[in-house]
Amino acid sequence: MNIYNKLRAREHGYGNERTYDFALRRLSVAKEDSWRGIAPANYCPDFNPEPPIFSAKFANCDGYRHILAIANEDGKITLQDTTQRNHQPEEQSLVGPQCHFNAVFDLEWAPGQMRFVSASGDHTARLWEVAGSGIRGLNSYVGHTRSVKSAAFKRTDPAVFATGGRDGAILIWDIRANLNMDLTSRVDNCIYSGHTGGPGTPVSQRKQRTRTPKMAGGTTSSSITGLAFQDNDTLISCGAGDGVIKVWDLRRNYTAYKKEPLPRHKLPYAGSSTFRGFTNLIVDASGTRLYANCMDNTIYCYNLASYSQRPLACYKGLLNSTFYIKSCLSPDGKYLLSGSSDERAYIWNLDHAEEPLVALAGHTVEVTCVAWGSSHDCPIVTCSDDARHKIWRIGPDLDGLSEAERAEKYRGTASYVREFGKKAFGPSSGNHKYNLRDLESTPRSLKRLMDQNERTPGSVEKTTTKRSFLEMLGVAGQETEATEQPQKRAKPLESRGRRLFGPSSQETACRHIQLQSINEEDASPSKRQKENSAAEDVSPLHKLLSTPSHSPLSENVNHVYTSPPTTSAAAAAVAADALNPPPISAAIYSPTSNLPNYVLDGEAPHLGIMSPKRKAKEKVDWLTNIRKQKLMSGRAHVTLSEKISEEQQADVLASPRLQSLRQSECSPRIHASPRRRISHTDGGGGTPAGSSSHSHSQSQPKTPTSSRRNSETTLLRFFSIQRSSSVPAEETTTTNAAPSSSDPHPPAVTAPAATPLSMRTPTTAVGSD
């Protein structure tokens, strides 16, 4: 009831608003009102003999508000008249048609008509009409790429409804719209990616034909778990992972949005838990209050008049561990009913949000969906995963019945959770806490219960499992219990991090010496100042060395340290106190106190073998590295080619005439040019000049160096060859002229002396002048 109705009621004399909390205590399930859900389907290969019920809602039409529609996991939907009772000795199952070929997650009645829409896991939503005693399908709406999770009609328009699915899309449908070219229903408005981010369903990146456009890579789509219309132009939605409730203005065309659509208002998650997903949304009759079931075991109430991000109330006490738990309001809007994962359903008085008013116990597993009828007896329906649904009615008081009679006649009873005298109207209602015995009737988590027990004086005392260090000493700690009280552990003086091993006995004694208090009765203030200055002159190292360790592991150490002589009486007193260790309760012992102290002894066996130090890396640039590599390569062993190059360099240093003579006598490449020259001057037979030059060009490629050498020595080689060839030519002429032409056996021609040219080119004929 809103504030306006309250003011009008006060004007008419009805100032005191009365409730019926006492009547809810008498809710019970008679044996005739316990049903076994819908009969299972036989078509599915995964046969489930007890399919759970996912949705149950009463009709929203006058004269038929006692009709209940329920849908199960097999895709079956059936109608039940809640005024009829089951008079059979056993629980009976209802018979319903096969409406979908997958689970039906939600259904919603049209306002003022006997029509309802169903949302299924087969990616479709279907419109049904009640005809006689059965249902008839009117149309199928295909637009989602994943399971359709929720559906909602406009508050006063039975022709427009909205659907939300696991693909993150919210589709607005108008049953009066024309069909598409493929005779499918046309979407009136689309809100794609309404709830993105969080642990939602990842989007597939493979290419496929879908009606829902894909989002950018790396983003996730949060499933649409709840839809509710505030009015005909305002739609409210919630997601499974983003933790935000969004308010959409349907007068905008969200279909034309290419980027993420922007809602008109946002209501972020108001808690501090990581379970921030919402499972269900309901709006009261006035349209000013929004109730949202959250995964953090809380139902949040928001003010829709101002869209404040801070909730008005937080209804606690349930256990919400799945996305199938739903809630509803009473017909008068004064009470809130919700399912729970602890096998119960809970009813809250909206004026007291701290804890539930009544708990309905009768199911054996999680209670998922609930419904509150508006007929004359206001029945309550609870559905569970045990494939049972129970109808709760207000009956007689059961306190006078025995346990056997109650178990025989009833299948569910209600019990108070909140105490009226202390909780509802008491001044200290906010300080009420639970004890361990209340765990059976209160769905509190164990952690929350233990936190409450810490702050409750009369509750079970919490015992710590931690032991102090003195308790772990065992016998040594027990000896001191009789003489003195256990003291708290002293705060360490050093400000650095904690040490892995405790301090040695010497260091403990030194610390105890520093913490020794000075008795004011022993000396005057001036004398105490002198003694303090003298005590400061004694270094802590000398104090430590004055009390050597008596560990058996350090007996082989021959070093004996003695403290330097002091003339001060205060220093001697300090040294005497160091020899007397403090009592066990005041000192802190360590398991390593008797081990050798290599720092004080000055020697350690592991320090003799030290790994060599690494040479520091020299910082040299890349140019210097290249220069060093060239120098190192020059110092390597000399190869045969390098020796030949050194000999050529030695020849260059000789005189030009000596170089020409060496080249003319030894180089075979230089004699190739006179062959070409002789062949040009020779008019007789022999190898043609063209073929000789061609073969030479193939065997000896012409380079700038070789051409330069040939040009420099051409003249010198020409005269040297002419000189060597002129003398043998004269001898051959005189020899050939001696025999006659008639001699049948002419003497053999004696070959001239072999020259380098004739030896290298035996096929070349030397012409005579």
Curated annotation (Swiss-Prot):
<keyword id="KW-0677">Repeat</keyword>
<dbReference type="GO" id="GO:0043161">
    <property type="term" value="P:proteasome-mediated ubiquitin-dependent protein catabolic process"/>
</dbReference>
<dbReference type="InterPro" id="IPR001680">
    <property type="entry name" value="WD40_rpt"/>
</dbReference>
<feature type="compositionally biased region" description="Polar residues">
    <location>
        <begin position="705"/>
        <end position="714"/>
    </location>
</feature>
<feature type="repeat" description="WD 3">
    <location>
        <begin position="194"/>
        <end position="249"/>
    </location>
</feature>
<comment type="subunit">
    <text>Component of the DCX(DTL) E3 ubiquitin ligase complex, at least composed of Cul-4, pic/DDB1, l(2)dtl/CDT2 and Roc1a.</text>
</comment>
<feature type="repeat" description="WD 6">
    <location>
        <begin position="362"/>
        <end position="393"/>
    </location>
</feature>
<feature type="compositionally biased region" description="Low complexity">
    <location>
        <begin position="728"/>
        <end position="743"/>
    </location>
</feature>
<keyword id="KW-0597">Phosphoprotein</keyword>
<feature type="modified residue" description="Phosphoserine">
    <location>
        <position position="679"/>
    </location>
</feature>
<feature type="compositionally biased region" description="Polar residues">
    <location>
        <begin position="546"/>
        <end position="562"/>
    </location>
</feature>
<feature type="repeat" description="WD 4">
    <location>
        <begin position="264"/>
        <end position="303"/>
    </location>
</feature>
<protein>
    <recommendedName>
        <fullName>Protein lethal(2)denticleless</fullName>
    </recommendedName>
</protein>
<dbReference type="InterPro" id="IPR036322">
    <property type="entry name" value="WD40_repeat_dom_sf"/>
</dbReference>
<feature type="repeat" description="WD 2">
    <location>
        <begin position="143"/>
        <end position="174"/>
    </location>
</feature>
<dbReference type="InterPro" id="IPR051865">
    <property type="entry name" value="WD-repeat_CDT2_adapter"/>
</dbReference>
<feature type="region of interest" description="Disordered">
    <location>
        <begin position="476"/>
        <end position="562"/>
    </location>
</feature>
<feature type="modified residue" description="Phosphothreonine">
    <location>
        <position position="201"/>
    </location>
</feature>
<feature type="modified residue" description="Phosphoserine">
    <location>
        <position position="655"/>
    </location>
</feature>
<feature type="modified residue" description="Phosphoserine">
    <location>
        <position position="691"/>
    </location>
</feature>
<comment type="pathway">
    <text>Protein modification; protein ubiquitination.</text>
</comment>
<feature type="region of interest" description="Disordered">
    <location>
        <begin position="655"/>
        <end position="769"/>
    </location>
</feature>
<dbReference type="GO" id="GO:0007095">
    <property type="term" value="P:mitotic G2 DNA damage checkpoint signaling"/>
</dbReference>
<keyword id="KW-0131">Cell cycle</keyword>
<dbReference type="InterPro" id="IPR015943">
    <property type="entry name" value="WD40/YVTN_repeat-like_dom_sf"/>
</dbReference>
<feature type="region of interest" description="Disordered">
    <location>
        <begin position="196"/>
        <end position="221"/>
    </location>
</feature>
<keyword id="KW-0833">Ubl conjugation pathway</keyword>
<keyword id="KW-0346">Stress response</keyword>
<feature type="compositionally biased region" description="Polar residues">
    <location>
        <begin position="503"/>
        <end position="518"/>
    </location>
</feature>
<feature type="modified residue" description="Phosphoserine">
    <location>
        <position position="524"/>
    </location>
</feature>
<comment type="similarity">
    <text>Belongs to the WD repeat cdt2 family.</text>
</comment>
<feature type="compositionally biased region" description="Low complexity">
    <location>
        <begin position="689"/>
        <end position="704"/>
    </location>
</feature>
<feature type="compositionally biased region" description="Polar residues">
    <location>
        <begin position="657"/>
        <end position="666"/>
    </location>
</feature>
<dbReference type="GO" id="GO:0005737">
    <property type="term" value="C:cytoplasm"/>
</dbReference>
<dbReference type="GO" id="GO:0016567">
    <property type="term" value="P:protein ubiquitination"/>
</dbReference>
<feature type="region of interest" description="Disordered">
    <location>
        <begin position="448"/>
        <end position="467"/>
    </location>
</feature>
<feature type="compositionally biased region" description="Polar residues">
    <location>
        <begin position="758"/>
        <end position="769"/>
    </location>
</feature>
<feature type="modified residue" description="Phosphoserine">
    <location>
        <position position="711"/>
    </location>
</feature>
<dbReference type="GO" id="GO:0030674">
    <property type="term" value="F:protein-macromolecule adaptor activity"/>
</dbReference>
<feature type="modified residue" description="Phosphothreonine">
    <location>
        <position position="456"/>
    </location>
</feature>
<feature type="modified residue" description="Phosphoserine">
    <location>
        <position position="204"/>
    </location>
</feature>
<feature type="compositionally biased region" description="Basic and acidic residues">
    <location>
        <begin position="524"/>
        <end position="533"/>
    </location>
</feature>
